[in-house]
């Protein structure tokens, strides 16, 4: 009797798997419904053209002005960059089918690493598939339980995740608060190495880290300085070296991580640049480097040409800066609050998640592509539409964007 009960009552492996899958679907459906209900659902628009100031979007007739790309210098569709990618593809193939330390290193990879190090005036550089990987691979390889890392509370998610992976003692200081950083540095004096980690420019707020003060405190308390320059490389500073050049502390920042996927052609890839022994250690221990395929040759060729163009002239940097000032001044004159410093990331602060999402949708109806950001990407109550200016936007593009903001803002009560 008992055996019969067990036979008929127990679920077969197939039925147990089906039951577990059904439970998972129920949990996921509930999570997704919660996101929709909160008004924070993120939809992916499908672009059917090249990246640029004017794009085509699936389902929408006519050209759309793009104000939400990281294409700060407009190099993602630059003819010379595209041609360099094609030539490298033809000469070196589609990919390496290998990691760097096996048979995935070509001369072009070493040449690009040398060019990056020269550009940043550092000893050496190492390429990664993305800057997310560079951040994920740095802290775990460098820091031990004897060490400490001190991180700005609004650092990019990739920095936060990278720090979580390491075994160092972790301190978080209030955003841009140098008094709090100093207090944390005092607490961390007992540790072997102390590394202050910060974004150079913060991607959601458009504000710039006070690197002069950070470097001063680091020197005072015997700490190293790490800066993520993803939203600075190529266009901040007189020659586009980044926030350390902008603020005159290039010789005081120890480690820089940045990307090839934004201003420098926009294709893909990231890197770490700094002291030669550090880069050598990363080649031996950094897991994203050791266990990821090499950057495709075409991506390497595009990035290398983008750096060449940047080092030939800073005219494109000046153009982007002038257009950024134009947008910010006109938006503020219209009554909007635009966060951050004179950075091409221009967050139009709205506060309410639904409002930012609805206004972004209505901006698209007027031919302007922008994105609303809300929790959990930004803190609750800090929803905004992030506008990003490119050197290849015309003054007419800027003015048309501002006019659309004014019309949509009045429609939704964001302006009187």
Swiss-Prot record:
Metabolic or biological pathway: Amino-acid degradation; L-threonine degradation via oxydo-reductase pathway; glycine from L-threonine: step 2/2
Pfam families: Aminotran_1_2
Binding site for pyridoxal 5'-phosphate: 131-132, 203, 259-262, 292-293
Cofactors demanded by this protein: pyridoxal 5'-phosphate
Post-translational modification N6-acetyllysine, affected residues: 42, 184, 380
Modified sites of kind N6-succinyllysine: 42, 184, 323, 365, 380
Similarity comment text for this entry: Belongs to the class-II pyridoxal-phosphate-dependent aminotransferase family.
Record's protein name: 2-amino-3-ketobutyrate coenzyme A ligase, mitochondrial
Biological source species: Mus musculus
Gene: Gcat
């Amino acid at each position: 009797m008992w055996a019969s009960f067990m036979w008929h009552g127990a679920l077969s492996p197939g039925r147990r798997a089906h039951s577990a899958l059904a439970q998972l679907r129920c949990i996921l459906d509930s999570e997704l419904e919660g996101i929709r209900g909160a008004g924070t659902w993120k939809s992916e628009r499908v672009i059917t053209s090249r990246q640029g100031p004017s794009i085509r979007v699936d389902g929408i007739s006519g050209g759309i002005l793009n104000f939400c790309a990281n294409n700060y210098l407009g190099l993602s569709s630059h003819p010379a960059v595209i041609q360099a990618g094609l030539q490298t593809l033809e000469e070196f193939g589609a990919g390496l089918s290998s990691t760097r330390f096996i048979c995935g290193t070509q001369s072009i990879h070493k040449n690009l690493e040398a060019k990056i190090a020269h550009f940043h005036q550092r000893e050496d550089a190492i390429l990664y598939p993305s800057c997310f990987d560079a951040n994920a691979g740095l802290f775990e390889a460098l820091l031990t339980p004897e060490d400490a890392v001190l991180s700005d509370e609004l650092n990019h998610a990739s920095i936060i995740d990278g720090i979580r992976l390491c075994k160092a003692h972790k301190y978080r200081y209030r955003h841009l608060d140098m008094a709090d950083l100093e207090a944390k540095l005092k607490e961390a004096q007992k540790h072997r190495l102390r590394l202050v980690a910060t974004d150079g420019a913060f991607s959601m707020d458009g504000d710039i880290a006070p690197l002069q003060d950070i470097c001063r405190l680091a020197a005072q308390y015997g700490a190293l300085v790490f800066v993520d320059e993803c939203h600075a490389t190529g266009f901040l500073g007189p020659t586009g070296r980044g926030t350390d050049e902008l603020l005159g502390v290039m010789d005081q920042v120890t480690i820089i991580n940045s990307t090839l996927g934004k201003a420098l052609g926009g294709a893909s890839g990231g890197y770490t640049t700094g002291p030669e022994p550090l880069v050598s250690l990363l080649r031996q221990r950094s897991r994203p480097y050791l266990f990821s395929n090499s950057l495709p040759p075409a991506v390497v060729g595009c990035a290398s040409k983008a750096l060449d163009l940047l080092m030939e002239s800073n005219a494109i940097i000046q153009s982007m800066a002038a257009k950024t000032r134009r947008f910010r001044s006109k938006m503020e004159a219209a009554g909007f609050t635009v966060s951050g410093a004179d950075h091409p990331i221009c967050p139009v602060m709205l506060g309410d998640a639904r409002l930012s999402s609805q206004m972004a949708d209505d901006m698209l109806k007027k031919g302007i592509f922008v994105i609303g950001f809300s929790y959990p990407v930004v803190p609750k109550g800090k929803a905004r539409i992030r506008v990003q200016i490119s050197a290849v936007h015309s003054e007419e593009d800027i003015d048309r964007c501002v006019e659309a903001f004014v019309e949509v803002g009045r429609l939704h009560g964001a302006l009187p």
